[in-house]
Amino acid sequence: MAHTDTDDLVGLLDADDQNLDIPATLPMLPVRDVVVFTHMIIPLFVGRDKSVRAVDAAMAKDRFLFLATQMDGAVENPESDQIFKHGTAARILRVLKLPDGRVKVLVQGLAKAKIVRYTKKSDMFRVRIELLHEEDLGDLDMETEALMRNVKESCEKILGLRGELTPDVTMVLDGIDHPGRLADLVASNLNLKIEEAQSIFETIDPVQRLLAVNGFVSREVELSAMQARIQSSVRDEISKSQKDYFLREQMRAINRELGEMDEKTQEIKEYQDKIRKAKMPKEAKEEAERQLKRLEQMHPEAGEAPTVRTYLDWLVEVPWKKATKDTLDIKKAKEILEEDHYGLEKVKDRILEYLAVRKLNPKMKGPILCFVGPPGVGKTSLGKSIARAMGRKFYRLSLGGIRDEAEIRGHRRTYIGALPGRIIQGLKHCKSNNPVFMMDEIDKIGADFRGDPSSALLEALDPEQNFAFSDHYLNVPFDLSSVMFITTANMTDTIPSALLDRMEVINLAGYTENEKVLIAQQYLVPRQVKENGLKPEDITISGNALLKMATEYTSESGLRNLEREIGTLCRKVSRKIAEGKKGPYQITASSLVKYLGLEKFLPEMDQEEPQIGLATGLAWTHWGGEALYIETTLMRGKGELVLTGQLGEVMQESARAALSYARTNEDELEIDPDLFDNFDIHIHVPAGAIPKDGPSAGIAMTTALVSALTERPVANDIAMTGEVTIRGRVLPIGGLREKSLGALRAGIKTIIIPEKNKKELSEVPQQVRRKLKYITVSHVNEVLEKALLPAEKKKAPPKKKPPKKAAKPKAKKTQPKAKTTEAADK
C-alpha cells in the first residue's frame, strides 16, 4: 500500500458527507497518474494554464471542482477523448500559490459522477455532470462481512510486513462498516496502474468493487511477502559476511600469537620467493612487486584477485633468464642435420656458419631465417632438426589464417580472460628464452578490423628491437634477442615488404626424381614400415618402383604424396600379414598396379603432337614449377583480342605486347595483314578456375600467336619462359630451378630461357641439366626459329569480304587437356 499520512487518513474517514448541493456544471481539472476516490483528501500540484484557470473559477464561485484522470499522463494538453468519463466531484479545501507559478491545491472527493457533455469554454474545461449514487445495502450478509474481514486482515498483513502497522491504522480499519468505503480506502492506497484503479472506481456496486479490490490486495500480499524474504536474505548474507570477517580476523590474531601464517600470508610469501627466483629485469620486478602489494591489500574473495594472481603467475613463470646451452660441436651438429634431411646444403651450411660464429662470439644475436619453398620439401621438419642439432627447445606456431593482432601481442589485462600473445606463451611452454621458434606459413597471415598481425611481427622479428619486445598482457619489456626465429612460406609475394626485409630468405626448391628415390629409401620407407607395424624384412620396395611412384603416381615438388603412396603399400602388406599370409613381399615397378591401381600421371608431352597455336610455357607456383599451356585460335571477326583463363593484368599486357610485335613485324614473319582486320584472335590459358599472372609467359604467348597466324605448328617437346617486349627483346625471369624440375616432370626435353638467366644454370641440379637441353635467347626471332616447325601446306590467304554464308575457318587440331596449374611467376 502507498504511504499515507495517518492524519490525512483519519481526516478522510471522519469527513461528513454533508448533503452539499453540487452544481450540475463544474470546471474540470484533468489529473495525471492518480485516480481520486470519494472521501479522499489529496494535494494536487497544478501548473497547466487550463488547470490553473479551472481552480481559479472554482475558488471564485463555490469551490466545487470535477476531477477526471487522463488516459495517458504524458500528454501535456489532453483532448476530451483522452480523459476518462468517470470522475469525482470534489471541493477545494486549501489553495497555495508556489514561487514557480504553480498552485498547490488540497481537495477532498465528495461524490462519483460521470461527464454528460463538455460545455464550450476555450480557456478551460467545463463539463456538465451526472452524479452516481450507490444503492443502500441495508444489513450486510455474512458473505459480505467475511469479504470485508478478509480485506482488512490482508491490509494489516501488508502493513505488518512493511513495518508500517500502527494502532491508529488498525483502529481506522476496524471502524469502517461499509464495503464501498473500505474498497475506496484500500484502492486509493494500493500501487495500482491507472487502468486498474479506474476500473475499480467505475464499479458502482460496492460489493463488486470490494471483490475487485480483494484480488489486488491478495497480489500485494504475495509481493510484500516476497520482498520481505529478499530483504531477510540480504540481511542474513550481510550478517554471515560480517561473521566470517570477524572469525577470519580472530584466526589471524591466533596465528600471529602461535607464530603461524594464514593462507593469504602463505600465498604472499610464495609469490615473493618466486619473484626472487625468477631473476626478472628491474622493470618487470618492480611491476611484479607492485601487483603483489595490491593482492596483499585485497580481500581474498575480491573480484579482481584472480586476475592479479593470474598475472603474477605469468610473470614468475616466463623464462626471463632460463636458457639451454647451445651444442657448439659443429661436427656433431652436421651429423644430426645429415641424419634427418637429404640435400638442402644451403640451409645446413647457414646453420653451421651460425654455430661457428656463436662459438667465437657467444653474445651474437639469433638469426631470423625464412625458408621459402613448395609444400612437402621439409621446411617445418628442418626446423626441428636445427633445434636438435643446436641442443635447443623447439616451438612451432602456425600463422595461417591468424587475423587478430592480439594473437601475437596478447590482450590487455582489462579484458576478461586476457592472456599473453602466442610468442610469450611459446616461451613459457619451452621454459627457455632461447628456443628455435618456428613461425609456419607466414605468407598466409590475414588482416581485419582487429588489426594486422604482420605489423605486430615487425618488432618481434627485428634484431634491433626485439630485445625489448612489449606484450600487451605483460606490459613489461621481454628480451627476444636470444630466440632463433625461423619462418616458412610457399611464396614471398604476400609477405609485407617491411617484414620480408627483416628476414634472411633461403629458397628450398623441389626435389629431382633421383633425390626423391634416395630420400624415400633412407627416410620415408623406414618410417612408414615402422608406423604400419611391419618389420624391415616384411617388405622391400625396389628403386625402380620408387622412381615410378615419384613420376607416374605423384606430380609434386615435395614428398608428401610420395610418402602417402608408400604408406598405402605398407598398409596393404600389413593387412595381408594380419590375415595370415606369409611374406616377405617384393614390390617392383611392374607390380605397383596391383597395389596402387593405374598410373595417375603420365608425361604430358607423350600424349601430344606438334599443333598450330599451342605453345608450352613454364610457371612457378606455390607448389613448384609446372607446365603452362597457351592456346591461340583465329575466328572471323573485327580484329579484336580475346583473353580468357583468369589472366592477371601482367599476363594480359604480355598478350597485347605479343600482338603488337606480330603486327609490327608482319612482313618479316610472313603474316597476312588482312588477318588482323578480319579475324578475332582468342588466347586461352587452360585451368580457367585458377588465377594466373606474371610476365614470364611472354615468349610462349608470342610463339602461340605467331603459330596461329602463320599456321606453323609448335614443337611439342620444347617449353619456354621469358618476358617479351614490343621490340622483341627477351627479358630474364625467376625460379629457373623450379621451372626446370617442372619441365622434367612434364616430359619436356628442351627449354628456351633468356640469355641473362644463363648464369643461374649452376643452381639447377646436375642430374636435371643432363636430362634437359637449354637454349638461351635474347630476341623473339631466335625463339620462333627454334620452336616453330615448317608449315605442312601453304594456305591461301582468306578473302577480305567473305560471302554471306561463309564457311567456318578450317578447324584446328583438337587442343589437349592442359594440366592444372596456378600462375606464371612474378
Swiss-Prot record:
GO cellular component, one term: cytoplasm
Catalytically driven reaction(s): Hydrolysis of proteins in presence of ATP
All residue ranges annotated as the Lon proteolytic domain in the record: 609-790
Main location (coarse class): cytoplasm
Active site (catalytic residues): 696, 739
Keywords: ATP-binding, Cytoplasm, Hydrolase, Nucleotide-binding, Protease, Serine protease, Stress response
Signal peptide from the UniProt entry: none
Keyword Signal in record: no
GO molecular function: ATP binding; ATP hydrolysis activity; ATP-dependent peptidase activity; sequence-specific DNA binding; serine-type endopeptidase activity
Chain residue ranges for the region called Disordered: 788-826
Basic residues: bias regions: 796-816
Function: ATP-dependent serine protease that mediates the selective degradation of mutant and abnormal proteins as well as certain short-lived regulatory proteins. Required for cellular homeostasis and for survival from DNA damage and developmental changes induced by stress. Degrades polypeptides processively to yield small peptide fragments that are 5 to 10 amino acids long. Binds to DNA in a double-stranded, site-specific manner.
Protein name per Swiss-Prot or TrEMBL: Lon protease
Organism, scientific name: Desulfatibacillum aliphaticivorans
Upper lineage: Bacteria, Pseudomonadati, Thermodesulfobacteriota, Desulfobacteria, Desulfobacterales
